[in-house]
Amino acid sequence: MEGINKTAKMQFFFRPFSPDPEVQMLIFVVFLMMYLTSLGGNATIAVIVQINHSLHTPMYFFLANLAVLEIFYTSSITPLALANLLSMGKTPVSITGCGTQMFFFVFLGGADCVLLVVMAYDQFIAICHPLRYRLIMSWSLCVELLVGSLVLGFLLSLPLTILIFHLPFCHNDEIYHFYCDMPAVMRLACADTRVHKTALYIISFIVLSIPLSLISISYVFIVVAILRIRSAEGRQQAYSTCSSHILVVLLQYGCTSFIYLSPSSSYSPEMGRVVSVAYTFITPILNPLIYSLRNKELKDALRKALRKF
């Protein structure tokens, strides 16, 4: 009982990137700029899709919701990370606050990954079954797929968060990270975590491999269908749309796999923190850039909106 009470009252601190205040301030400015850029880019996509009736199609519906997910995803960790940078690692987070941050980060990140599968399915139907596209991709199905992505993210996040915070935490209160990531928090537990690490690895493998396999299968059929398109313009348009999605998938799944599927023996906290910067800050910036720069309809809608202002 005493151990449980100690754990409940614990506070965690995040290890600074550098002991030099000037370096910390520089990283703070970089993180803040990346965060604001991510917010601006993703909010722009969501608003452009909403106000432009020509973009009210399933593909852009999913793209807009992906942008909204990215906003909440980065916002679940950035404010605390920025406060920690300013305080040189002296900003505490309670165990409840850490668990809450982990839950929302995994929930939104999981929903993000599932939504990428949904977007691949949408493109598969659009390219391989164009005549039946409107019949298959009804608005009711689109909403169901979106809600399903959120539900799966929730069902992934809740048991993982409970699994990790069921562990006892003792004297070591410094998290070698800039947010409450699962492997980093688990390293602070004063108990045997082999079962927990194995469970996390198995769940991560299933959660990452199944969606990635479904996306890969979809794109095998899509590539075959694109090669059959006689029009060079049609092939180029299909290729441009699909290549944008593939780039986003590679960024998201590549970074996540490195963090959660690396063997414990070869896991480097420092490298894990660097890679985490890529998929928590850089990927949400690149997503709107990749989609907007490679999508003619979205670029045209953005130009029209800018001309109005």
UniProtKB/Swiss-Prot annotation:
Residues 1-25, 76-100, 162-198, 260-272 are extracellular. It is found in: Cell membrane. The keyword Transmembrane helix applies. Pfam families: 7tm_4. PROSITE patterns: G_PROTEIN_RECEP_F1_2 (PS50262). Residues 47-54, 122-140, 219-238, 294-309 are cytoplasmic. It is a multi-pass membrane protein. Glycans are attached at N5. Disulfide bonds join C98-C190. Odorant receptor. Belongs to the G-protein coupled receptor 1 family. This is Olfactory receptor 10V1. It comes from Homo sapiens. The lineage of its organism: Eukaryota, Metazoa, Chordata, Craniata, Vertebrata.
